[in-house]
A protein has these predicted regions:
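H/E-rich (His + Asp/Glu) clusters that bind or coordinate divalent metals
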Residues: 1-113
Length: 113
C-alpha cells in the first residue's frame, strides 16, 4: 500500500476493493501528509489489520501512528527492523475516520448473522 497513487487509482476503479494496513506502517509513516489525505479520502475503504502478532508494542505503534502527530519515532521495536532503519511520523486522523478504520468498515464487510 505504500504507492498511494496506484492504490488510489485501484480504489477509484474497483468500488468493492478494500485495503488494510498490514506490514505498511514503515512506508506510510515516511509520507505523513499524503497518507493522511489518502486515509481521509478513502476512509470507507480502509480496515485496520496487522500480521505482526499479538505483541502490545506493535499495536501501540499503530495507534501512535494513526492517532497522533508524533514526529520521528521508531516504528519497529525489534532488534533488526523488518523494513529499514528509519523513523516515521504520525498522521492524527479525525475521530470519525479512526472509527471507520478500526471498526465500522469491517463490520460492513462482515455483518453479523
Amino acid at each position: 500500500m505504500e504507492n498511494l497513487g496506484w492504490v488510489g487509482r485501484v480504489l477509484d476503479e474497483a468500488p468493492n476493493f478494500y485495503v488494510d494496513l498490514s506490514a505498511r506502517l514503515a512506508e506510510l509513516g515516511r509520507q505523513p501528509y499524503t497518507t493522511r489525505e489518502f486515509f481521509i479520502k478513502y476512509q470507507n475503504r480502509i480496515v485496520f489489520g496487522t500480521d505482526m502478532g499479538m505483541e502490545l508494542g506493535v499495536y501501540r505503534n499503530y495507534y501512535r501512528f494513526l492517532e497522533t502527530y508524533d514526529e520521528y519515532f521508531n516504528y519497529d521495536t525489534s532488534e533488526v527492523p523488518g523494513q529499514g532503519r528509519w523513523f516515521i511520523y504520525g498522521i492524527k486522523l479525525p475521530a470519525q475516520v479512526l472509527k471507520k478504520v478500526y471498526r465500522e468498515n469491517m463490520r460492513r464487510l462482515l455483518p453479523r448473522p
